[in-house]
Amino acid sequence: EALLRQPAYLMLPEQEREILWAAALLHDVEKRSTSVDEGNGQVTSKNHAKRGETTVRTLLYRDIPAPFNIREHIASLVRHHGLPIWLMEREDPLKRACEASLRLDTSLLKQLTVADICGRISTDKEVLLEATEFFEMFCREQQCWGKAREFANGTARFHYFHTPRSYIDYVPHDDFKCEVTLLVGLPGMGKDYY
């Protein structure tokens, strides 16, 4: 219901509306298995998004067959639906935002999160909505709003995500040329004596 009240949602192409709608329906699917009463009147659902991603992927593969890119987009939205709220509080927010942008449309992610916030019974809605606005500004600044963050090449992307505290625009030397000799044959044909 909160999603339908967003003007940005109504202006989306039909395919993106359906993806967002499915993600909104399924984003908390694993709260049923992860909810724990902490004993102080507080109920937590740690890792429900990670488990939800797996459940959604399985559901959209086995029970309701969906094309690969649509299935993965919905599963990624479910996995990252809390990212706009807590991004700036975590270690290396740039890496997390860029990583998410490679898997999903960050503008759709913000819409999903806003709908989730508006559908809650909560006293801190304004603070959470402000966090989603900061998320949008941060993604725009880092060139990953509504599109995947672009890197100079695949080596630069790999280096950034696999090297701690690396600079996002660093381009490593990529002269990886070498000569390969590949011997193919049946066993016992003399490949060892080439």
Residue spans of the language-model regions?
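Generic ordered-secondary-structure signal
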Residues: E1, E18, V43, S76, ...
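Charged, amphipathic alpha-helical linker segments immediately N-terminal to NTP-binding catalytic cores
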Residues: L104, A115-F161
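Glycine-rich phosphate-binding loop of ATP-dependent small-molecule kinases
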Residues: R140-Y194
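Divalent metal-dependent catalytic cores for phosphoryl transfer on phosphate-bearing substrates
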Residues: A2-A131
